[in-house]
Amino acid sequence: MDRDILFRGLKAPLRLTDADPVLRLLPEVAPGWPHEVRPADPALRPFYAIRGEVEASRFLCENLIEPASPRSMDAVNAACDAMAALAMALPAEDGSVICLHAAGVAMAGRLVVFPNIRRAGKSTLSAALARAGHRVFSDDVVPLSFPAVGPPLARSMGVAPRLRLPLPKTADAGFHDWVAAVAGPRNRQYAYLRLPDQPAEGETLPLGAFVILDRQEGPGPARLEAVAADQAMDVLLHQNFTRDRHSGDILDVMAVALAGVPVFRLSYSGLEAAVDCLEAAFRAWPAGTPSGPVARFRLAEFETTLPDVGEVVRQRAGGVAREIGGTLYLADPEGRGIHRMDALAAAIWELLEEPLGRQELVAVLEESFPNIAAERLAGDLAGLLARLAEAGLVGPG
């Protein structure tokens, strides 16, 4: 039987075909996002489809927002993957939202965001903070909107926190016992947590801080230190689920956000020490309330043909350049990507505000680097200009 699961506020459904075991999981996997079950409507294009296979307890799963080959999964993994697709369906219908691959935990009335870094422990640390009484907005995806005034607003999706299994060796017996007591649906890879008083879909909090996690293998104290904003930007560049948004718009709002939201690195080994460190640091926040209309994002233009670059080169009109933490970031006019410039690339970019010939650029480099052979400088410049042209940042003068 075909069923459509309609999540409140979304037009596109999750479509289930002979997938009752997955349907039974949804109230526990997404307890805070109200949804209703209806007979499938052929006129509606689903954001994700799950079909029961002949083999017992297996389901063929297909993401229809970012099409890829269907994959066979068990019921828990099918529900997990559907929640990831839900994080793409939300901004697909709301042009004011981008979704970050990150965890977000409420502390003293603001959200502390932990951008995804492989094996850094964001989900486990989020669970440890939940155990200490802090509400988890998400362990995996944080939707953000950007009001005209004040910090960005983070939004809950009402999805239950999920832990990767097995738990890390650094987790103590008390944490293991707590997880066992609150565990919901699980398989060998993941365990969802049944937690009381968690935020419902649509609940918002101002962003308080970005915290880059640095989990240590050996024992040691937890340490929180301020870092430059570009370190957060470098991480966030690769953690945006909303890939159809115009990169110039994203660069604009992130530059403003990172100018006002502090960035830290948390080095830690044990969970309890990390929780204590975060609680000590984030007891209160500076005054400031988000207000005004939220930014709306243009869509990127991926089909545009880029012009060939000849002997004379210049910046292409319509690009966006922003300095974040002392580092220059550029977005092309079509909004297809954001690019970090090193010192040399930034200097060349500034020179190309006016049309310049390649030989003129080599001459400038020869003055700046007299100990490097002209042939090498010319080769390095050619490679840099080719990369800038491929990124759509420079064009013919």
Task: List PLM regions with ranges.
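Long, basic/Gly/Ser/Thr-rich N-terminal segments
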Residues: 1-81, 85-86, 280-289, 301-306, ...
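Post-Walker A alpha-helix
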Residues: 125-126
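Low-complexity, glycine/alanine/valine/leucine- and proline-rich hydrophobic stretches
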Residues: 227-243, 322, 326, 332-350
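Glycine-rich, often acidic-flanked micro-motifs
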Residues: 4, 8-12, 17-26, 103-108, ...
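Long, charge-rich, low-complexity alpha-helical segments
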Residues: 289-290, 334-397
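N-terminal pre-Walker A segment at the start of P-loop NTPase domains
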Residues: 79-99
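Conserved lysine of the Walker
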Residues: 122
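Short solvent-exposed loop/turn micro-motifs enriched in small/polar/acidic residues
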Residues: 96-98, 312-315
